[in-house]
């Protein structure tokens, strides 16, 4: 079974332009993410999936320099980009680690791989419930990737709203009746602040990440992050104010998807 990690990344983010090349501990985010994911044993390749747009030339130039595998494809439809990349690399199962999910843990990547290998799922994603998808839980959706069977992408490509094919693609799998899906439920026994955001969407997230990585360096788990936050409560103030902004943007994108 050919299992590859796909990292969707593009430089034209409106909230934090060129975020994948922003540096943390003097290492660009995309390179730091790849370094962390190299600890996963059960994957063939780690592939950055970017677009054919000229605005992503700089990213591709960097990937070539660092000898990181990449694929350039459709700039308006991420699922088509995934499908085309899968055809090129003969991928059967995609482990979807978004380029701004820098905190994704190799341990949970391996868990998702195991679930996909041992069950007949088309799609699996981390969640805090077995029934209702909750994308606002930024602990789970910051450290746990999604698993996608390539053959299932064909089933959902026609369901995507023509006006917006870059966001809300996971929700298509979640909401489709033709998809065999599963929620990987993770309930931490540790206290998790509701305002914790383990992603890089806004400048405040970048500032927060720089603080975390300056303390913990490259290899750490969510438990280490929670301990740092408990010992340094002021760190959360950097990201508390943007949660409402994120939720507003998410809801607007879902309305258009």
Give residue ranges: language-model regions.
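N-terminal nucleotide-binding beta1-loop-alpha1 segment
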Residues: 1-16
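Short beta-strand/turn micro-motifs composed of small residues
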Residues: 9, 50-52
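A short, N-terminal amphipathic alpha-helix
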Residues: 29-46, 59, 65-66
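Conserved beta-strand segments of alpha/beta enzyme cores
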Residues: 45, 69, 180-182
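Short phosphate-binding loop-to-helix
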Residues: 53-119
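Conserved core of the sugar-phosphate nucleotidyltransferase
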Residues: 104-196, 207, 211, 227-257
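Short, conserved phosphate/pyrophosphate- and ester-handling motifs at nucleotide-, phospho-/glycolipid
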Residues: 202
């Amino acid at each position: 079974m050919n299992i590859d990690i796909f990292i969707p990344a593009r430089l034209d983010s409106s909230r934090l332009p060129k975020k994948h090349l922003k540096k943390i501990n003097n290492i660009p985010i995309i390179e730091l993410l790849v370094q962390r994911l190299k600890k996963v044993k059960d994957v063939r390749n780690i592939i950055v999936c970017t677009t054919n747009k000229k605005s992503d030339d700089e990213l591709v130039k960097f990937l070539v320099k660092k000898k990181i595998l990449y694929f350039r494809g459709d700039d308006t439809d991420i699922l088509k980009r995934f499908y085309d990349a899968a055809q090129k690399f003969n991928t059967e199962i995609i482990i979807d680690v978004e380029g701004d999910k820098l905190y994704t843990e190799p341990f949970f990547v391996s868990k998702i791989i195991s679930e996909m290998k041992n069950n007949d799922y088309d799609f699996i994603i981390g969640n805090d419930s077995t029934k209702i998808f909750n994308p606002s839980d930024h602990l789970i959706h910051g450290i746990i990737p999604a698993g996608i069977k390539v053959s299932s992408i064909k089933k959902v490509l026609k369901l995507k709203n023509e006006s917006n094919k870059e966001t809300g693609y996971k929700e298509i799998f979640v909401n489709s009746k033709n998809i065999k899906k599963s929620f990987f439920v993770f309930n931490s026994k540790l206290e998790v602040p509701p305002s914790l955001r383990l992603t890089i969407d806004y400048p405040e997230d970048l500032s927060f990440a720089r603080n975390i990585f300056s303390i913990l360096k490259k290899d750490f788990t969510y438990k280490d992050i929670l301990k740092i936050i408990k010992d340094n409560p002021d760190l959360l103030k950097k990201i508390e104010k943007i949660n409402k902004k994120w939720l507003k943007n998410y809801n607007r994108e879902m309305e258009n998807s």
